[in-house]
Amino acid sequence: MIKRGFPAVLDENTEILILGSLPSDESIRKQQYYGNPGNDFWRLVGHAIGENLQDMAYEKKLKTLKHNRIGLWDVFKAGSREGSQDSKIGDEEINDFSGLKEMVPKLRLICFNGRKAGEYEPLLRGMGYETKVLPSSSGANRRFSKNRESEWEAVFRH
């Protein structure tokens, strides 16, 4: 089944861009980035910036990210996948990142949320960006990464 990503959430003041892979089924259903309550994204970022993002309404979450100069997007514009696991993504169509420098002139760091998104780190690094691959915020990754919270937190102290 073909799944489509969401539009980028960024503006001319964005300094840090977090790239996921492709929205989960729950996120697609809700039409929200990281809409699956089992995903720790909002908790991890909220902890790092000193905001209780997980208890905010979605639009307020996005406004808070923008206020903190954080943008969201996905590596993939679309892809086929049964279920929500990144390992099941096939027939990927990547987003067009060629215009980022013009659209987001203050962008200084691109972070990849998890291994699948991180496979495209060399592409963005090759475009001249500082990059970092972070442990996945997926709830399924919780037990595999002891330092996950500190790695996410370090990005925002950068």
Curated annotation (Swiss-Prot):
Signal peptide: none
EC number: 3.2.2.-
Keywords carried by this UniProt record: DNA damage, DNA repair, Hydrolase
Domain of life: Archaea
A biological-process GO annotation: DNA repair
Protein role: Excises hypoxanthine, a deamination product of adenine, from double-stranded DNA. Acts on double-stranded DNA containing G/I, T/I, A/I and C/I base pairs, but not on single-stranded inosine-containing DNA. Also has minor xanthine DNA glycosylase activity. Lacks any detectable uracil-DNA glycosylase activity.
Recorded family membership: Belongs to the uracil-DNA glycosylase (UDG) superfamily. Type 6 (HDG) family.
Protein's name in the database: Hypoxanthine DNA glycosylase
Species this protein is from: Methanosarcina acetivorans (strain ATCC 35395 / DSM 2834 / JCM 12185 / C2A)
Top-level taxonomy: Archaea, Methanobacteriati, Methanobacteriota, Stenosarchaea group, Methanomicrobia
